[in-house]
Amino acid sequence: MLRAASYESLSGSLAKSETSTRSNTRGKGGQSRRKESRGKMRAVSSSSGAFPTEQVLEVWRTSDAVAFDVDSTVCIDEGIDELGMYVGTGEKVARITKEAMEGGLPFGEALQRRLEAMAISRELLESYVKEHPPKFSPGIKELVAKLHAQGKDVHLISGGFRQMIAPVATELGIPSENVHANTIVFNEDGSLKGFDDKEFTSRAGGKADAVKFIKSTKGYKHVVMIGDGATDLEARVSGGADIVIGYGGAQRREKVVAESDWFVTEFDTLVNAL
């Protein structure tokens, strides 16, 4: 795991990269460059004071693609929980979500239990999507725009529902084929039938499978996963995500803080590090 470095470690690394420039510099010019170096270090730190290692920064800057979780990452809320509130079963659905995100419940089981609790119909789902536009996390639009400007592909990998994530992808300029999420299946009369169990994220370890799929089919050398939950950490496997960046701007989960390669609470931190 390429874990976060100390301030002193990264300070030394950045200092080495500028040694040749500073070695012949004196006076105010040298002071200016030292201030610039300190500014670079502050730019890539999270609000918790942790710095990424050189290796993590290198992967972040040279990655071919970045995959984002959606709920409590790209968007500030948990979409399934909000849908549960809409149909009147919000508290029960939220409890199941919390248990799953903290790693205490297999995701496939959690998905089935939440759908059963909501008993959502096609009509209700369509109404919800129309009445609830995406609530984006601060800085995510700027980050995605910069990733696109640098020629990096952006994917959304979510345990949420494709029908609810489609507007998110559209607004961020992410093509539909780069959305990997669950699909609610309805009967002909519009009543709930279940979910498509062929989707990657309908099962445990699905995010890892999704990343391995896009990495192999797209020929990516490096893929970064960004998310707030335990299922995002699972993407860091052989052939999967090279690093996982934990995001705590909406929900802070201690497992993610402890086990991610880099933990941030603001997307501006990632923008500044590109």
Predicted regions, residues:
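Short, acidic/turn-prone active-site loops that include or flank metal/cofactor-
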Residues: 181-186, 248-253, 268-270
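Conserved Lys-Pro-Asp/Glu-containing loop-to-beta segment of HAD-superfamily phosphomonoesterases
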Residues: 202-233
